[in-house]
UniProtKB/Swiss-Prot annotation:
Clinical condition linked: Bardet-Biedl syndrome 4: A syndrome characterized by usually severe pigmentary retinopathy, early-onset obesity, polydactyly, hypogenitalism, renal malformation and intellectual disability. Secondary features include diabetes mellitus, hypertension and congenital heart disease. Bardet-Biedl syndrome inheritance is autosomal recessive, but three mutated alleles (two at one locus, and a third at a second locus) may be required for clinical manifestation of some forms of the disease.
Species name: Homo sapiens
Assembly, per entry: Part of BBSome complex, that contains BBS1, BBS2, BBS4, BBS5, BBS7, BBS8/TTC8, BBS9 and BBIP10. Interacts with PCM1 and DCTN1. Interacts with DC28B. Interacts with ALDOB and C2CD3. Interacts with PKD1. Interacts with CEP290. Interacts with DLEC1.
Subcellular location: Cytoplasm, Cytoskeleton, Microtubule organizing center, Centrosome; Cell projection, Cilium membrane; Cytoplasm; Cytoplasm, Cytoskeleton, Microtubule organizing center, Centrosome, Centriolar satellite
GO cellular component: BBSome; centriolar satellite; centriole; centrosome; ciliary basal body; ciliary membrane; ciliary transition zone; cilium
Protein name: BBSome complex member BBS4
Function: The BBSome complex is thought to function as a coat complex required for sorting of specific membrane proteins to the primary cilia. The BBSome complex is required for ciliogenesis but is dispensable for centriolar satellite function. This ciliogenic function is mediated in part by the Rab8 GDP/GTP exchange factor, which localizes to the basal body and contacts the BBSome. Rab8(GTP) enters the primary cilium and promotes extension of the ciliary membrane.
Region (Interaction with PCM1): 101-337
Recorded family membership: Belongs to the BBS4 family.
Record keywords, A-Z: Bardet-Biedl syndrome, Cell membrane, Cell projection, Ciliopathy, Cilium, Cilium biogenesis/degradation, Cytoplasm, Cytoskeleton, Disease variant, Flagellum, Intellectual disability, Membrane, Obesity, Protein transport, Repeat, Sensory transduction, TPR repeat, Transport, Vision
Residue pairs linked by disulfide bridges in the UniProt entry: none
Keyword Membrane on entry: yes
Length: 519
């Protein structure tokens, strides 16, 4: 029995560990970043209220020393539009971590959004000292210099950004600089490189197509716009531009089909309704044209091109008082355009205000040094008032402009203007050999003459950050001459592109030019 007891004791030894004294638990120190994962999770889910609640709790625990919580709260403030508050929080982050280039970049970004571009440049330069190979710093420095109109420094910074890392947005801003400087060729070169780098970027393709459209290179314009629509069939900018090209060539029904697609995407677009209205004008549906143009004017009341077109349509409908109203409004916004004064003079002539019509014609002649139609209409008015000497002077000035256009271009004059000038020349006894009449190439075409419109090199770009064109025409009011009709002209104005890749930004095509015949 004793042996069994010994074996039992040997088989089950008594543990000595339980007899040792238990160690105390290590003290828990607050971890500043322990809630960062939860803050990040709420932020990327855009659950900002829950995110701010966690941030508040985290900052209370850490006594305001959690850098990430402050950083995310500053981002939320910026999204909510509280730029000044976000700036102060980002500055706090920069104090907590002075060697972080990201914090300085965010401080500079907030300064930029507040319009303090010089201060933003200083902070970006400090960030560049901490990280010299960050393309974003160079890009944003270039953007700041653009707003300060220091284009040379802006180009240097943007080129530096492209050397560090190529991005679509950098190409777009570099192209914007060339557009601001009026150098379309360099802008096209930049956008061509951008398209080579990013061939599926519809914004780049559309902008490049619009630049070619502005230069009158329709084949390349249509090619790039077509590529943009291939990648994005609902790209309303490209559709609007393509419709504008069709409208320019007189395909009004096809253009309206294109615009119907755009109307679903952007039903409140002023350029869209302007172009639709001028399509109806080309189809001689004047009531529909006025309705669409009135809607465009409601959406963009300060756009002078819409007012111009409204005046033009009312002139066509012989509603001269309404035409005077819209043309006067257009002149208030664009006081340096001679064609506006010419059409205003036509309206005044038909309203029997001859003295003011003469003043308007005189201003048109002073402002427009290239369009012979201004001088022709002025000569007609003077002839009808019995001032043959002054009428002859205007007629001779018209012939000089025609000769200049004939030497510099091969565009066509409208046959009605040719006929009217011949009648006036005969009445003034100077019309035996007009310098600008050419033989007709085939019986179906108009007279092969130089154009009544100015060549592209003489024209002022007519667009804004959207697609707006114009129907450039004129009407000479005859009373004593038997024809009783005025000259017409056809203009195709190039578009002016938006300066930034923003919705407002928005590059847009120009619209077609139409004709007006005023009896």
């Amino acid at each position: 029995m004793a042996e069994e007891r010994v074996a039992t004791r040997t088989q089950f030894p008594v543990s000595t560990e339980s007899q040792k004294p238990r160690q105390k638990k290590a003290p828990e120190f607050p971890i500043l970043e322990k809630q960062n994962w939860l803050i990040h999770l709420h932020y990327i889910r855009k659950d900002y209220e829950a995110c701010k609640a966690v941030i508040k709790e985290q900052l209370q625990e850490t006594q305001g020393l959690c850098e990430y919580a402050i950083y995310v709260q500053a981002l939320i403030f910026r999204l909510e539009g509280n730029i000044q508050e976000s700036l102060e929080l980002f500055q706090t982050c920069a104090v907590l971590s002075p060697q972080s280039a990201d914090n300085l970049k965010q401080v500079a970004r907030s300064l930029f959004l507040l319009g303090k571009h010089k201060a933003a440049i200083e902070v970006y330069n400090e960030a560049a000292k901490l990280n010299q190979k960050d393309w974003e710093i160079s890009h944003n420095l270039g953007v700041c210099y653009i707003y300060l109109k220091q284009f040379n420094k802006a180009q240097d910074q943007l080129h530096n950004a492209l050397n560090l890392n190529r991005h679509d947005l950098t190409y777009i801003m570099l192209g914007k600089i060339h557009l601001l400087e009026g150098d379309l060729d360099k802008a096209i070169e930049v956008y061509k490189k951008a398209v080579e780098f990013s061939p599926e970027n519809t914004e780049l393709l559309t902008t490049l197509g619009l630049l070619y459209l502005q230069l009158g290179i329709y084949q390349k314009a249509f090619e790039h716009l077509g590529n943009a629509l291939t990648y994005d069939p609902t790209n309303y900018k490209a559709i609007l531009a393509a419709g504008s090209m069709m409208q320019t060539h007189g395909d009004f029904d096809v253009a309206l089909t294109k615009y119907r697609v755009v109307a679903c995407a952007v039903p409140e677009s002023p350029p869209l309704w302007n172009n639709i209205g001028m399509c109806f004008f080309g189809k001689k549906k004047y009531v529909a044209a006025i309705s669409c143009l009135k809607r465009a004017n409601y959406l963009a009341p300060f756009d002078w091109k819409i007012l111009y077109n409204l005046g033009l349509v009312h002139l066509t409908m012989q509603q001269y008082a309404s035409a005077f109203h819209f043309l006067s409004a257009a002149i208030n916004f664009q006081p340096k355009m001679g064609e506006l004064y010419m059409l205003l003079a036509v309206a005044l002539t038909n309203l029997e205000d001859i003295e003011n019509a003469k003043r308007a014609y005189a201003e048109a002649v002073h402002l427009d040094k290239c369009n012979p139609l201004v001088n022709l209409n002025y000569a007609v008015l003077l002839y009808n008032q019995g001032e043959k000497k002054n009428a002859l002077a205007q007629y001779q000035e018209m012939e000089k402009k025609v000769s200049l256009l004939k030497d510099n271009s091969s565009l066509e004059f409208d046959s009605e203007m040719v006929e009217m000038a011949q009648k006036l020349g005969a009445a003034l006894q100077v019309g035996e050999a007009l310098v600008w009449t050419k033989p007709v190439k085939d019986p179906k075409s108009k007279h092969q003459t130089t154009s009544t419109s100015k060549p592209a090199s003489f024209q002022q770009p007519l667009g804004s950050n959207q697609a707006l064109g114009q129907a450039m025409s004129s009407a000479a009011a005859y009373r004593t001459l038997p024809s009783g009709a005025g000259g017409t002209s056809q203009f195709t104005k190039p578009p002016s592109l938006p300066l930034e890749p923003e919705p407002a930004v928005e590059s847009s095509p120009t619209e077609t030019s139409e004709q007006i015949r005023e009896k």
